Amino acid sequence: MQHNSLVARYARGNLVLQILVGIVFGILLATVSPSHAESVGLIGSLFVGALKAIAPILVFILVAASIANQKKNQHTYMRPIVVLYLMGTFFAALAAVVLSFLFPTHLTLVTGAEGATPPQGIAEILRTLLFKLVDNPVNALVEANYIGILAWGVGLGLALHHASATTKAVFEDLSHSVSHIVRFIIRLAPFGIFGLVASTFATTGFSALASYAHLLAVLLGAMMIIALVVNPAIVFFKTKQNPYPLVFQCLRESGVTAFFTRSSAANIPVNMALCEKLDLDEDTYSVSIPLGATINMAGAAITITTLTLAAVHTMGIEVDLMTALLLSVVAAVSACGASGVAGGSLLLIPLACGLFGISNDVAMQVVAVGFIIGVIQDSAETALNSSTDVIFTAAVCRSEQQKSQ
């Protein structure tokens, strides 16, 4: 009986506070017993694995069900959300350019990133994304190819739009059932994050990051400017309301989880649950959240721009204003295609370095630096990317609701 009451109290507890407790205990365990801390990393891996496993099914079922059950003349607000995604990514690249010029970083380059193959150009990235669009639906689910999943989900939803009410009800019930499983997995987040924090501190530590403190400061500074200045400004522009309650809630409930899972895909169920909590339009967020995990890449744009300009300053190359603006555009476009590249934003750095005539050997050494600081860079990048998906979706939904009142 006491066991049941403990479980009930845990289930009713504040999830964010429970996650913070998990973080503290993870750091303590890594400090006291690194060997045991590495062992509990298994819990973190299981948590991330569970999120990654449920996310493709969740997206496919939700998208198909929401489109199939959409009423006539019912509008979704995808166009303004996509515009905000693209604007946010470009502004992120621009912020990184400004900070990189104000506080130029000089790197000590020694070795390259072995076994990594960067894309040859924008055309290759677009080609990869197009082929992901027409992927086999079963393979798309197995490989967690969200572009393919979205395409097939939308296609099936449109096909089912004229199906019988019973068939539509089955898909609606399926979406509710999958959502229940997601809520159960999210309740286990404190244990998962405890394992992730403990193993990260035990295996990596932060001594390796000390020599790259300046580079990290520029990277994280640009990300904070986007998260705390630019994103709130965009939300205020759309809603004409104080943006900070929404921004802080999204950073707290989406950003913290994304920071430790380091996976936009794994954070899709968390974002879906947050959108439901914010009472947003399900037909909109069921599409905008998985799409955002694919193309809304403000953090990736910052990483590409900052590390490319670090290489530029290290090589002593002069950069004029127009080239810097061109870099912002290239970084923004490349970042939107980061999901189409194995290794994500870091392997798009050679593409941006090509603008300045920097050799592939030097560019791959910069990529190696990116891998060294990845424990912080990748975590912060994912937290910014993922929380921004909800922020922009909420801003547009609330703006459209105000217009309709």
Swiss-Prot record:
It holds the Pfam family SDF. It is a multi-pass membrane protein. GO terms for biological process: serine transport; threonine transport. Keywords: Amino-acid transport, Cell inner membrane, Cell membrane, Membrane, Symport, Transmembrane, Transmembrane helix, Transport. InterPro entries: Na-dicarboxylate_symporter (IPR001991), Na:dicarbo_symporter_sf (IPR036458), Ser_Thr_transp_SstT (IPR023025). It catalyses: L-serine(in) + Na(+)(in) = L-serine(out) + Na(+)(out); L-threonine(in) + Na(+)(in) = L-threonine(out) + Na(+)(out). The chain crosses the membrane at residues 15-35, 43-63, 81-101, 140-160, 188-208, 217-237, 289-309, 315-335, 362-382. The keyword Cytoplasm does not apply. GO terms for cellular component: plasma membrane. One of its GO terms (molecular function) is neutral L-amino acid:sodium symporter activity. Its main location: membrane. The keyword Membrane applies. Belongs to the dicarboxylate/amino acid:cation symporter (DAACS) (TC 2.A.23) family. HAMAP family: Ser_Thr_transp_SstT (MF_01582). This is Serine/threonine transporter SstT. It comes from Vibrio parahaemolyticus serotype O3:K6 (strain RIMD 2210633). The lineage of its organism: Bacteria, Pseudomonadati, Pseudomonadota, Gammaproteobacteria, Vibrionales.
